[in-house]
């Protein structure tokens, strides 16, 4: 909510000089976002809250800061609120019915066939032969989970499968971790400390930098930190189109760093060129064709490459250190060391946390691990379930691992009351008025409301 307030205010700063906007009126209904004549916002209230949840627009406001409260009030100033009811992503009638029942206030029972369709996505109890059959052809599928322990595993599995599919060399890039307060203990060897530090799965605890980077030409990646605002920002996606090794990197011909063919472990951190999705900005110098090599790249030449949307991604140093608990292997003594990490700020797009999965259509498919963290409330379990079941276009494109016994009751219970009531408190009256007004406009235009 505080971020929403900041966005509304900064939009006024940007438009004040050109449009004579009065900054002090930025929170008035007609003046928000710099008096933009039309502001359209799209979203789904049935999504996981931000981290921390207290920052969300639907969070408890009793002890919220002034900026938070201002953001909520600006958010509530919508003229029209319309809830879309037709899901265009899906091709599976059973899946649509299940999701419709999930959204029904008060809950709704699944039929035996509907529950069987969910259970049949689970491969946990299948034989090894059947699991291999079901997993065949899923090299480019998404793999996601609510826990970082599983996601960190997927961040290794998906690049290897993607590299095999692309017939490309997979480069392994270990992070450079710097210990700022190393204890004077000979048993805490470099190898031991490296293993302990690299075993931390949650990238939120490591400056959003992975302990091991894996990359190959053609891999679809997600940036884990901002590289170049406002376009190459956190969670931007793109394709790896270039891998420039450090000049001091040992030659692959003289140093065999991996016994597995097609994998190369790097000693130095490379520079990765990524072509960002949906971006046309020219961040890098153009590459001239042979004809224009002596002069400069020509805009009219189809062979000259201006590398639109391409950006060079270098290793970043985490902005602050992070704590790591280390046990003395020879005693019960524990140390808290502070570590700062340098690493490429990227990971494969297909390995995803449940939060990052929101808003994504997981095409060609999704492998989902149904293990909820113990701290997940009933509300978070329902939201995570809804997100997982609503990402793939069909249940045939969902492979489940470890469907819990409680999943059916989660689905049938319907959305937790708090989610619905918080949204209705803000927008129920406006939503009803919007439907009435929409019907009137359609009649005025002569449109058929049944289309």
Question: What positions do the PLM features span?
Answer:
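Conserved ATP-binding/catalytic motifs of P-loop helicase motor domains
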Residues: 1-451
């Amino acid at each position: 909510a505080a971020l929403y307030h900041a966005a509304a205010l900064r939009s006024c700063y940007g438009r004040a000089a050109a449009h004579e906007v009065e900054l002090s009126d930025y929170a008035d209904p007609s003046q928000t976002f710099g008096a933009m004549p039309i502001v359209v916002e799209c979203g789904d209230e049935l999504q996981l809250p931000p981290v921390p949840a207290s920052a969300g627009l639907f969070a408890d406001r009793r002890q919220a800061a002034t900026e938070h409260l201002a953001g909520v009030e600006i958010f509530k100033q919508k003229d029209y609120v319309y809830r879309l009811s037709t899901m265009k992503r899906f091709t599976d009638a059973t899946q649509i019915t299940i999701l419709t029942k999930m959204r029904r206030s008060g809950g709704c029972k699944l039929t035996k066939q509907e529950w069987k369709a969910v259970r049949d996505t689970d491969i946990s109890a299948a034989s090894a032969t059947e699991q291999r059959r079901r997993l065949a052809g899923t090299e480019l599928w998404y793999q996601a989970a609510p826990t970082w322990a599983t996601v960190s595993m997927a961040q290794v599995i998906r690049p290897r499968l993607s590299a095999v599919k692309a017939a490309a060399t997979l480069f392994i890039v270990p992070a450079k971790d710097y210990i700022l307060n190393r204890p004077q203990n000979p048993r805490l060897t470099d190898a031991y400390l490296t293993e302990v530090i690299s075993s931390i799965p949650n990238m939120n605890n490591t400056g959003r930098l992975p302990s091991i980077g894996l990359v190959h030409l053609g891999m679809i990646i997600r940036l884990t930190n901002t590289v170049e605002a406002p376009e190459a920002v956190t969670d931007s996606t793109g394709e790896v189109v270039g891998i420039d090794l450090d000049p001091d990197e040992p030659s692959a011909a003289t140093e065999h760093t991996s016994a597995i063919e097609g994998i190369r472990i790097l000693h130095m951190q490379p520079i990765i060129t990524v072509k960002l999705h949906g971006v046309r900005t020219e961040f890098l110098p153009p590459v001239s064709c042979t004809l224009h090599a002596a002069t400069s790249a020509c805009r009219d030449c189809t062979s000259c490459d201006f590398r639109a949307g391409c950006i060079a991604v270098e290793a970043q140093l985490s902005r602050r250190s992070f704590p790591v608990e280390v046990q003395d292997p020879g005693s019960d003594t524990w140390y808290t060391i502070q570590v700062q990490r340098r690493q490429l700020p990227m990971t494969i797009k297909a390995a995803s946390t449940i939060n990052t999965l929101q808003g994504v259509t997981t095409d060609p498919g999704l492998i989902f691990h149904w293990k909820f963290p113990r701290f997940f409330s009933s509300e978070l379990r329902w939201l995570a379930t809804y997100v997982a079941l609503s990402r793939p276009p069909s249940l045939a494109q969902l492979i489940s691992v470890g469907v819990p016994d409680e999943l059916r009751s989660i689905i049938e219970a319907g959305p937790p009351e708090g989610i619905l009531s918080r949204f209705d408190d803000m927008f129920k009256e406006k939503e009803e008025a919007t439907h009435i007004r929409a019907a009137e406009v359609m009649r005025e235009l002569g449109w058929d409301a049944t289309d």
